[in-house]
Structures are given as C-alpha cells and as structure tokens.
C-alpha cells in the first residue's frame, strides 16, 4: 500500500502506530519509511521524548502532537526535542481554544482535525470543523485539514476555507483503487 501511494502525487504518508484502538505498530512505521522516498508522518498519542526518539529511529520525517492531550509547556518541550532529532512537528487542534493555546509555539505545521481523536471519533464527520476554524489559524504556517476527507468535494471545501493541504486516512484504506482515489483527490483543483 505504501509503495502504491508513493507512486501517486502525494506530499507524504501518514502512519498510525497506536496499537490498542487503531492496530498500528512501530514496525509498520519503520517498514513504510524504508519503502518510500516520501516524508513519513508518525501519528500516535505522543507524550514523551522517548516516543520522539523512537519516531526518529524508525525513520519518520515528522511527528503529530495533539494539543488536547498536552499542556503548553509539554508541547514546547516536545517540539524542541523533535527538532533536535531532525523531525518536523504537526501540531493538531480541534477547537478555537486549542488554536490560541499553540499560536505562539515554534511548530512547523498546524492541523485541524475534523474529528475528535481524543474520544476515538471515527464517524462520518466532514470538513466543517476546518471551515469553522481555519480563519483563526493565521497564515504563517502551512495549515492541514485532517480526517473526514473522502472526496474531491471535501478537498475543495478544505482549500476554500484556507487549508494548504489535506491529510487523508480512512478513505484511502477503504477505497477500491488507492491510486485512482488519490488521483481524484489530487486533481480536485487547489484551491477551488
């Protein structure tokens, strides 16, 4: 699957390593990172420097930090540790309060998750949260609309709201043809 995705016009590949709820592993991260020449994002509930060290050792290019799970000082410390290990940081928010909490931090990418991952929400959300919150993110960093992207229409909506990119997960795994699906998304027109 990673090689198939790597043959598409995508900016990178996201790998979930959380085991209990999502069935991922660090071995999967290492396998994907070794298999593709693209940047690989390590997605998990990262709360410690040890996890960041493991991300770097597995070949990740970037890590996800979830604002809802961390205090501001923890976020700052983990961002710094990631940079020391050569990793970019995608800091994720899902409401306006979280955006304000992280605005001053030196992360690389800002994500708006259209689902509330802290409660393992995996329902049929849409990009409405990105549409509601993108205007509060400023324009200094790349903004990524995460999750609930399942069509070219969703991509156009995210772009129209101010997102610079989208992170697609479940819809890729559910598609009958990964390459066809990804080409449909990447040819959606950005921004609309």
Label the predicted regions.
Residues 19, 45, 148, 171-172:
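Short loop or secondary-structure boundary microenvironments that flank
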Residues 47-59, 95-106, 140, 145, ...:
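Catalytic cores of alpha/beta
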Residues 1, 26-37, 49, 70-77, ...:
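Short loop-to-alpha-helix "cap/lid" segments that border enzyme active sites
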Residues 9-10, 35-38, 57-63, 83-87, ...:
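Glycine-enriched alpha-helix->loop->beta-strand junction motifs that scaffold or abut catalytic
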Residues 42, 90-92, 111, 144-145:
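Generic enzyme active-site microenvironment
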Residues 1-90:
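Active-site entrance/lid segments in N-terminal catalytic domains of soluble metabolic enzymes
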Residues 15-17, 54-74, 111-121, 161-182:
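Glycine-rich phosphate-binding active-site loops on the catalytic face of alpha/beta enzymes
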Residues 130-136, 159, 172-192:
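C-terminal helical cap(s) of enzyme catalytic domains, especially alpha/beta-barrels
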């Amino acid at each position: 699957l990673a090689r198939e995705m790597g043959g598409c016009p995508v900016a990178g590949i996201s790998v979930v390593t959380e085991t209990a709820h999502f069935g991922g592993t660090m071995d999967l991260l290492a396998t994907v990172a070794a298999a593709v020449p693209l940047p690989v994002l390590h997605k998990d509930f990262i709360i410690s420097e040890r996890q960041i060290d493991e991300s770097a050792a597995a070949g990740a290019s970037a890590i996800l930090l979830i604002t809802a799970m961390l205090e501001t000082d923890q976020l700052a410390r983990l961002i710094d540790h990631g940079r020391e290990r050569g990793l970019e940081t995608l800091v994720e928010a899902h409401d306006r309060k979280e955006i304000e909490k992280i605005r001053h931090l030196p992360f690389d990418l800002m994500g708006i998750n259209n689902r509330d991952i802290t409660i393992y929400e995996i329902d049929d959300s849409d990009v409405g949260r990105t549409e509601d919150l993108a205007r509060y993110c400023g324009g200094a960093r790349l903004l990524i609309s995460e999750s609930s992207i399942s069509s070219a229409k969703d991509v156009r909506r995210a772009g129209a709201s101010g997102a610079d990119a989208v992170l697609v997960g479940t819809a890729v795994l559910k598609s009958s043809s990964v390459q066809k699906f990804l080409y449909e998304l990447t040819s959606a027109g950005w921004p609309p």
